[in-house]
């Protein structure tokens, strides 16, 4: 079992557009919790007890949410990446707090706790492992936007970030198990053609030094990169948990069709129909007679009286 995890959360989520204008990607809500907390829930279920979060230079929202450790079991340490110069520099910010074997995950990458447990077990099964990678079946185009791997039996013989010509049927996704030895390779990692220092280069350098790198395969993950992903991930958690969670007072004439999550501090007008597969965040308001299904309504958003919305992220203007 691995007890420590580093979470990379410094990215602003540019491809999410207006959704990240007033908060970082790590704080986007998934059925009542930030995606950061959802990720921590899965890691904690696999045995993680301490988290080191690498936040952006001016990002205080993570500290505000986790500052008292009341929202998640285990200790939360927050450090800041001053410049967005890649995963290597982000991990270097966390390095002083790493005490032994650890997991590394991006904040936008959700996998099952069973896979996390399997990844940790495969890493720990070989004492000479410097790393174990999470692999996901992928198309060549998907691999071009991720990392390609060369598999040799039960180990990784090579890794390349964003390859022009992928050789594998698997992409390495941003969930790794590492020994502290991997940290020794970080300072020498060069800047890539993309202008960043990338963790795949450190892994490749360790392989070239003769270090052992293992892997575990998963066929499932949720990845938040676009607004359609935020909708899909919310619907996954709503359907997984089922029924409904209503934390605001609603008029008697409101119809709720589960699964639905309504946070505290939501205003819902009379004669509205909410659901199925709908999440209303604190600070949102639904006009009288509105009908919502398969929607996420974010804080500050207003749905006009009588409006009908389906399959949408509804954000403030």
Named regions from a protein language model:
Residues 248-317:
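Structural signal for interior beta-strand "rungs" in well-ordered beta-sheet cores
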Residues 21-25:
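Short alpha-helical oligomerization interface
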């Amino acid at each position: 079992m691995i007890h420590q995890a580093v979470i990379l959360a410094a990215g602003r989520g540019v491809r999410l557009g207006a959704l990240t204008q007033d908060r970082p990607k790590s704080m986007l809500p998934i059925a009542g919790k930030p995606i950061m907390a959802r990720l921590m829930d899965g890691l904690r279920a696999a045995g993680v007890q301490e988290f080191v979060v690498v936040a952006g230079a001016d990002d205080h929202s993570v500290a505000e949410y986790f500052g008292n450790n009341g929202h998640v079991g285990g200790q939360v340490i927050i450090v800041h990446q001053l410049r967005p110069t890649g995963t290597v520099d982000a991990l270097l910010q966390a390095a002083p707090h790493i005490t032994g074997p650890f997991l590394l995950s991006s904040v936008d990458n959700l996998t099952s706790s069973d896979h996390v447990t399997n990844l940790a077990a495969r890493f720990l099964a070989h004492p000479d492992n410097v790393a174990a990678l999470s692999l996901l079946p992928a198309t060549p185009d998907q691999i071009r936007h991720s990392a390609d791997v060369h598999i040799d039996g039960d180990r990784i013989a090579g890794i390349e970030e964003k390859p022009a010509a992928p050789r594998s049927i698997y992409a390495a996704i941003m969930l790794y198990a590492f020994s502290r030895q991997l940290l020794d390779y970080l300072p020498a990692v060069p800047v890539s053609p993309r202008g960043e220092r990338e963790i795949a280069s450190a892994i490749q350098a360790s392989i070239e030094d003769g270090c052992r790198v293992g892997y575990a395969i998963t066929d499932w993950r949720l990845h938040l990169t676009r607004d359609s992903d935020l909708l899909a991930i919310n619907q996954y958690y709503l359907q997984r948990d089922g029924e409904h969670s209503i934390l605001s007072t609603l008029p008697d004439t409101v119809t709720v069709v589960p699964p639905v999550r309504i946070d505290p501090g939501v205003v819902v007008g009379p004669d509205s129909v909410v659901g199925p597969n709908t999440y209303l965040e604190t600070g949102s308001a639904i006009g009288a007679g509105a009908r919502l299904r398969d929607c996420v309504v974010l804080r500050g958003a207003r749905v006009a009286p009588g409006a009908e919305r389906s399959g949408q992220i509804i954000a403030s203007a």
